[in-house]
Amino acid sequence: VFQDIINPNSPKITQVVNAGQISVIKPNVAHTMVFTKDTTFLNLVRGERDHENYGITHTIKHVFVDEKEKKLLLENYKFDCRSCGNTDLKRVVSLGYQPLANNLLNKKNDKCELYPLEVNFCAKCYNCQLSISVDPKKMFSNYLYTSSTSKIFRNHFVEAAKKYMKELKLDKKKSYIIDIGSNDGVALKPFLDLGLKKVLGIEPAKNLAKLANKNKIKTFNGFLEKKNLKKIKKNADLILASNVFAHSDKLKEMTECMLSMLGKKGTIIIEVQYLMNTLKDLTFDNIYHEHYNYWSLTSLTNFFNQFDAIIFRAEKVDTHGGSLRIYIK
């Protein structure tokens, strides 16, 4: 963990140093090391630290990482790629330590927790992911963002429902649709309005699941994980996941669950922020702790190949500053 102490606006940055690698620290950079396993460490610093000015004019002792932060790094740092398991990750973006999105303070003197906000890149499968995985219960148990408040999103899902009904030849009486991370039911409501009878939302935020059920959009409150599968009706004709693949820390388990719920002739349609647009348009504000992953079509293809699932169509959509919509069998 290091930070330039000359520049007052410099961020605190983390960096993983794997076995056999050399870490070079520039002058005037405060730094400390958090060892994740028993390690033989060789310090190549020149000169003795116990000199006459030690602790007076330079080499001043400073608690740069306290016990709480050390525990956070040890427990929540993601050392391997969520997609392929590769451990050789390279940091490509650091926005320093930041609070959780929408975590607004009620009082001037209130304090909020800060977490590293950094993107690491996997050169093996081209996945991009955050360095720290914040506990999802802290972010999603009482989620503040309701998708239906946005007219743009409401219209987006209305048009999407019409498109899927026509292209996939969905039957109003028989077809069964599941929406993962369904929020307040914004993506399922248009199907009900079109006369489709069987829908199910899966939403971890209690407040949003309660709101959806109140509006007669059947919703299961919980994460999509194997322990919950027995509570969910399967054989779906269509499974939707809009921006969910950005929000999931347990990608492989979630994907296995989705495939197990899909009917033989069913289709999975995923919408996710498009990394190419983030890079091209410099939309760094789309990088925040809820978005564990940042996808390109190549990295999505590499990911789904592991499950013998095929992306048979991909198209660009305008949501979230530019997104991908992919169709999977």
Tell me what each language-model feature is.
Residues 6, 11, 30-71:
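Double-stranded beta-helix
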Residues 6-27:
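Short acidic-glycine-tyrosine-enriched beta hairpin
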Residues 74-152, 315:
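N-terminal juxtadomain amphipathic helix
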Residues 173-183:
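Conserved class I S-adenosyl-L-methionine
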Residues 216-228:
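Conserved SAM-binding strand-loop segment of SAM-dependent methyltransferases
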Residues 240:
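A conserved beta-strand element that flanks and buttresses the S-adenosyl-L-methionine
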Residues 252-267:
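A short glycine-rich, Lys/Arg-flanked "PGG" loop and its adjoining helix->strand segment in the class I
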Residues 270-293, 297-299:
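Short, glycine-/aromatic-enriched active-site segment of Class I SAM-dependent methyltransferases
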